[in-house]
């Protein structure tokens, strides 16, 4: 079934470039496509159809413009994410906000959410666990990669607020400072 859908997609690409460029968002969210397949089709759209790697979708009710990189992050398609970075897709403030909010969601999923802008004793214990340390390390590696690709360190306001609540903002400040220094050296 997914091969039929891709054949239809490729055939229609011959007739309507604009329609297929916006289809890149649908490709990313397509659960029937593996990450590797999605990355391949995204690369095809950008390289062969001439689609803009920095295209966005305006969400009027939220007054934000989500881009392909944010969609790849939200669907956890890391190969697609890396392909988009390599094709020059800019990391925007909306993506940084999503990364920040993923910390809040992670805490809530583990039964230790932030309430009234304060960390509960359970949350302060949870951040000592290996599970949290691995999550944080994974997100910080991602942030470092985004900084290396030109993301503005100032975009991480939401994450700073969340980490300040659990007294871990210094780690982020150091990462953002080091990432900005590397960018200036280049």
Language-model regions: role of each:
Residues 144-148, 152-185:
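Leucine-rich solenoid repeat scaffolds
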Residues 35-46, 76-85, 113, 120, ...:
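Ankyrin repeat structural motif
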Residues 27-31, 48, 78, 87, ...:
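Surface-exposed polar/charged interaction patches
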Residues 17-61, 175, 182:
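N-terminal segments that cap or nucleate solenoid repeat domains
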Residues 1-18:
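Classical Sec-dependent N-terminal signal peptides that target proteins to the secretory pathway
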Residues 50-51, 88-89, 112, 151, ...:
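Ankyrin-repeat C-terminal turn/loop position
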Residues 19-30, 54-71, 91-128, 154-164:
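Ankyrin-repeat boundary/"N-cap" motif
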């Amino acid at each position: 079934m997914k091969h039929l859908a891709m054949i239809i997609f490729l055939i229609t690409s011959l007739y309507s470039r604009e329609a297929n460029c916006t289809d890149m968002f649908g490709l990313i969210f397509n659960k029937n496509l593996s990450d590797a397949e999605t990355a391949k089709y995204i690369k095809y759209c950008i390289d062969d159809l001439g689609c803009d790697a920095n295209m966005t979708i305006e969400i009027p009710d939220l007054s934000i413009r989500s881009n392909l990189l944010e969609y790849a992050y939200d669907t956890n398609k890391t190969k697609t994410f890396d392909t988009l970075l390599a094709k020059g897709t800019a990391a925007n403030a909306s993506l940084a906000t999503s990364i920040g909010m993923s910390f809040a969601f992670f805490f809530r999923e583990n039964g230790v959410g932030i309430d009234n802008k304060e960390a509960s004793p359970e949350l302060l214990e949870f951040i000592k666990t290996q599970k949290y340390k691995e999550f944080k390390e994974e997100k910080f590696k991602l942030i470092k990669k985004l900084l290396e690709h030109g993301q503005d360190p100032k975009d991480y306001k939401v994450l700073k607020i969340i980490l300040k609540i659990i007294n871990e903002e210094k780690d982020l400040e150091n990462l953002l400072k080091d990432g900005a220094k590397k960018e200036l050296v280049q």
